[in-house]
Amino acid sequence: MLLEGIETLLVLSKEKTMSRTGSQLYISQSAVSKRIANLEKKLGKKLIVPAGRHIKLTADAEQLIASIGPTFNELHGLIFEQQTLEDNTLLRMDCSETLVAGYLGQTMGQHRKQDPHWVITTNHTPRIVENVQSGKATLGFCAGYLPANHGLLTFHLGDEPFTVISQAPLHALPSELITNDLANPANTYQAAMLHKQGIRPAMEMDSYTAAAQLALGGMLPALVPRSIVSTLKIEPQHCFDFAELADLTRPIHICLRASRYRSSRVQALITALHDAVPKAVLAPSA
């Protein structure tokens, strides 16, 4: 009961509403409220207060999350490690959506013929790392920088170049660009590099696909990774590479709990990713 309440509070701190928290935990909104109420009663502290359509955490709740959040995820992970991965145990690979769209279609279709007992889910990199730490995901396939002190086994598959997409020809580096969400910890490094070149992030999207489509529609040029060019089949006349941005790349990693690397099924999945992604990353843009 106590662990359920803590897990619910941790999810609520990210999702901000009872309904979204319930969706993440596959429980009803009333069950979320009941779990939080029981936790408040157990601890003798008020943990949440209404804030319009959202829920705001109290200072006591923030302190509780800061002190036990990492430990709770690690406990989940240790319990997860006790599970034996049989040939038919369902494996979950949590991935960056752009990496799935850009690189994994054909590779994963072939791999599923050999091992049908696994699924793909998509998340942002910080959440992927959390899910692997807690055992909710067996494997993470991440774009962008990983958070510090994650404690996971990682494999660096490559560094994906960025391209500027524009409807009209570009003869010089734009002063404004549509970017992805730079508040995402996996992407914050991009902000410093753009600032160095005097480029202002005019709009920040939650999707590289949305950024590219706006650019192709004539809104503003957009900064997108090479996989988006391939996925959307963007014509070469709309793709522009600038020497000033040559060092701007996004690292691609696999992450997992070290103990899971002993599984031959996990090793086979890692090999499939390792064989496919570097070729795509290093391939010339369209």
From Swiss-Prot:
<keyword id="KW-0238">DNA-binding</keyword>
<dbReference type="GO" id="GO:0000976">
    <property type="term" value="F:transcription cis-regulatory region binding"/>
</dbReference>
<keyword id="KW-0805">Transcription regulation</keyword>
<feature type="domain" description="HTH lysR-type">
    <location>
        <begin position="1"/>
        <end position="58"/>
    </location>
</feature>
<keyword id="KW-0804">Transcription</keyword>
<dbReference type="Pfam" id="PF03466">
    <property type="entry name" value="LysR_substrate"/>
</dbReference>
<protein>
    <recommendedName>
        <fullName>Uncharacterized HTH-type transcriptional regulator VC_2383</fullName>
    </recommendedName>
</protein>
<dbReference type="Pfam" id="PF00126">
    <property type="entry name" value="HTH_1"/>
</dbReference>
<dbReference type="InterPro" id="IPR036388">
    <property type="entry name" value="WH-like_DNA-bd_sf"/>
</dbReference>
<dbReference type="InterPro" id="IPR005119">
    <property type="entry name" value="LysR_subst-bd"/>
</dbReference>
<comment type="similarity">
    <text>Belongs to the LysR transcriptional regulatory family.</text>
</comment>
<dbReference type="InterPro" id="IPR000847">
    <property type="entry name" value="Tscrpt_reg_HTH_LysR"/>
</dbReference>
<dbReference type="GO" id="GO:0003700">
    <property type="term" value="F:DNA-binding transcription factor activity"/>
</dbReference>
<feature type="DNA-binding region" description="H-T-H motif">
    <location>
        <begin position="18"/>
        <end position="37"/>
    </location>
</feature>
<dbReference type="GO" id="GO:0006355">
    <property type="term" value="P:regulation of DNA-templated transcription"/>
</dbReference>
<dbReference type="InterPro" id="IPR036390">
    <property type="entry name" value="WH_DNA-bd_sf"/>
</dbReference>
